[in-house]
Structures are given as structure tokens and as C-alpha cells.
């Protein structure tokens, strides 16, 4: 049983800017796993932070918790134009992930936002909520991954056909996202290489999602594409950061070299992502039981 004091101690680590970013991330994922109103309250307090990376991750976790009590804070973040685009985007995506149709009006309103990543995110979230309404009771988390995705995977299993749908920029973004998650679920080298081709597509939002999905897939065939995208200084920081985190999750020696190369990147979100990714690399390469170890750090060993 987790005590109120323990949740408070983990929450204080999360919101303390003096703590190393890695410790704050581990605290965040611990709170996400614990869930409930106190965890939501602590996570919500972090949106004043100076790190866009941390704030975007706060929004991501609130969406993955799928608790309607997080809707008000996420709606505020989406509407707050002083927040960085990647933070607002993640808040919009999180509102779609929670799956409550009451936010449809708000998401439709921001589907024409002047910030293209925010507009596209809200369009996808509207697509997801409308899909849920048309397919009640149908599992959206089917497959080997537990994440709540911005679009349900396509039923198609053929990698060639899915690749074609993924890379066809004339198709609706929602349809291409469905192909993306289907490729991830199929898995294997061919699917990883098809996804990596998506890192060349036109939409920065799309490219960043490809980076995220390749991190979930953890296939080393994607490492060259991810490393090249991370190294491309003209690329959107939102995309580069996702590629860095994917390299941390894949955790092969070639990933380590790419991450170390950008640990002092002039772009804050890229620099911080490499820090967090190196911590993730360490975890993936270790025998540690879990990454979200906020409770273990509080409790003395038996």
C-alpha cells in the first residue's frame, strides 16, 4: 500500500527543479503508475517548469492514465499559447487519449490552430474520438503494446501495403497513423525499416510520432535512421528529441555514441532528451526491475 506521504515525497521530487532531470522523470513515471487524484494533482503542478521536455512528458502521462480528472489541466495547457508547441501538442493528444467525448468541441476549435503541430494533433484526436464513438467496445489497445495511441492500428498486416499507406502523403493523417501503429504491432526488421522511411516525410508531427514508435519497437535496424535524424540540426527539435529517446530505448552500442554526441546540443530539448535517454539506456542495459523506481528509492531495502 502506498501512503500519502510517499506520494508527496515522489511528487516533491517531480516538481523540484534542483533535482536531476532523470530523477524527475522516474518520479513522474512512478506517479503515472500509481494513478489517482493525488498523483494527477502533483503531475499538474509541473506545467510551470522551464523544461519543455518535462512538461510534454507530464501531458503524455496524464493522457496515458486515462482519468477524466486530468481534463481541466490538459485543456488549460492546450489553450495556453505561452506554452511551447510540443507541450500544447501533447496536451491535445492526451485529451484524445482519455477518450471522453466532452472535449470534442475544444479539439475541433484547435484543429485550425496557427501552430501546425497543434492543429494536426487536434485533428487526430478528433478522429480518434469519432472512431471510438463509431466502434463502441472495440479494443484500441489491441496488440503487444500497452500505450494508448493517437489512432487505432489498421487491420492490414501486410508490411508492403502498410508501408505504402504510411508514406502516402495524399492520404489523411489519421489513416497514415493507423498504418504506423499496425507496422509497429507487426514488428520485425522489415516493419522497422518501413517506419524509418517515415522519418523523411513532410509533417514534423508525423516524423516525431515515427521516432516514438521506433522507440517502442526497439529494433536495431532503425538505429541509422534515428541517429541521422538526431544529428540533423535543421530538423524540428520535437522530432530530434523523440529520436534521442528512441535510441535510449533501443539501447545498442551505436545508440550510445549518437546520444553522447548530442549531450551538449545547443537545443535544450535535445540536450535534455539525450540526458534522459542515457538514463533509459542504462536501465535497458541493467538488471533493474523497473524504470519507474520512485518508491524503491524511498523505501529502505528489506
UniProtKB/Swiss-Prot annotation:
Obligatory cofactor(s): Fe(2+)
Residue list for modification N-acetylmethionine: 1
Changes seen on gene knockout: Embryonic lethal between E3.5 and E9.5.
GO BP: peptidyl-lysine modification to peptidyl-hypusine
Binding-site residues for Fe cation 2, renumbered to this chain: 89-90, 208
Gene3D superfamilies tied to this protein: Leucine-rich Repeat Variant
GO molecular function terms listed in the Swiss-Prot or TrEMBL record: deoxyhypusine monooxygenase activity; iron ion binding
GO cellular component: cytosol
Residue windows of the HEAT-like PBS-type repeats: 54-80, 87-113, 175-201, 206-232, 239-265
Reaction equations catalysed: [eIF5A protein]-deoxyhypusine + AH2 + O2 = [eIF5A protein]-hypusine + A + H2O
Cofactor mode of binding and number, as noted: Binds 2 Fe(2+) ions per subunit.
Residues bound to Fe cation 1: 56, 241-242
SMART domains linked: EZ_HEAT
Keywords: Acetylation, Hypusine biosynthesis, Iron, Metal-binding, Monooxygenase, Oxidoreductase, Repeat
Pathway involvement of the protein, from the record: Protein modification; eIF5A hypusination
InterPro entries on file: ARM-like, ARM-type_fold, Deoxyhypusine_hydroxylase, PBS_lyase_HEAT
HAMAP family (alphabetical): Deoxyhypusine_hydroxylase
Function: Catalyzes the hydroxylation of the N(6)-(4-aminobutyl)-L-lysine intermediate produced by deoxyhypusine synthase/DHPS on a critical lysine of the eukaryotic translation initiation factor 5A/eIF-5A. This is the second step of the post-translational modification of that lysine into an unusual amino acid residue named hypusine. Hypusination is unique to mature eIF-5A factor and is essential for its function.
UniProt protein name: Deoxyhypusine hydroxylase
Organism: Mus musculus (Mouse)
Lineage start: Eukaryota, Metazoa, Chordata, Craniata, Vertebrata
Amino acid at each position: 500500500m502506498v501512503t500519502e506521504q510517499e506520494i508527496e515525497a515522489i511528487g516533491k521530487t517531480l516538481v523540484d527543479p534542483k533535482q536531476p532531470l532523470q530523477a524527475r522523470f522516474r518520479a513522474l513515471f512512478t506517479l503515472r503508475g500509481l494513478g489517482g487524484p493525488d498523483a494527477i494533482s502533483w503531475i499538474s503542478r509541473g506545467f510551470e517548469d522551464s523544461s519543455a521536455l518535462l512538461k510534454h512528458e507530464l501531458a503524455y502521462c496524464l493522457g496515458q492514465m486515462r482519468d477524466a480528472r486530468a481534463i481541466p489541466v490538459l485543456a488549460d495547457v492546450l489553450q495556453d499559447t505561452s506554452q511551447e508547441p510540443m507541450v500544447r501538442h501533447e496536451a491535445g493528444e492526451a485529451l484524445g487519449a482519455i477518450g471522453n467525448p466532452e472535449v470534442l468541441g475544444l479539439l475541433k476549435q484547435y484543429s485550425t490552430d496557427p501552430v501546425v503541430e497543434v492543429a494536426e494533433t487536434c485533428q487526430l484526436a478528433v478522429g480518434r474520438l469519432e472512431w471510438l464513438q463509431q466502434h463502441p467496445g472495440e479494443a484500441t489497445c489491441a496488440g503487444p503494446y500497452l500505450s494508448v495511441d493517437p489512432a487505432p492500428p489498421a487491420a492490414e498486416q501486410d508490411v508492403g501495403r502498410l508501408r505504402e499507406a504510411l508514406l502516402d502523403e495524399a492520404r489523411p493523417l489519421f489513416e497514415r497513423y493507423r498504418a504506423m501503429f499496425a507496422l509497429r504491432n507487426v514488428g520485425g526488421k522489415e516493419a522497422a525499416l518501413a517506419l524509418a522511411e517515415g522519418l523523411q516525410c513532410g509533417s514534423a508531427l508525423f516524423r516525431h510520432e515515427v521516432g516514438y514508435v521506433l522507440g517502442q519497437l526497439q529494433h536495431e535496424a532503425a538505429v541509422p535512421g534515428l541517429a541521422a535524424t538526431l544529428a540533423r540540426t535543421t530538423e524540428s527539435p520535437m522530432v530530434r528529441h523523440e529520436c534521442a529517446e528512441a535510441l535510449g530505448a533501443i539501447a545498442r552500442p551505436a545508440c550510445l555514441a549518437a546520444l553522447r554526441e548530442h549531450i551538449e546540443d545547443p537545443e535544450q530539448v535535445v540536450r535534455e532528451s539525450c540526458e534522459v535517454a542515457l538514463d533509459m539506456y542504462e536501465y535497458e542495459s541493467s538488471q533493474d526491475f523497473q524504470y519507474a523506481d520512485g518508491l524503491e528509492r524511498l523505501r529502505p531495502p528489506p
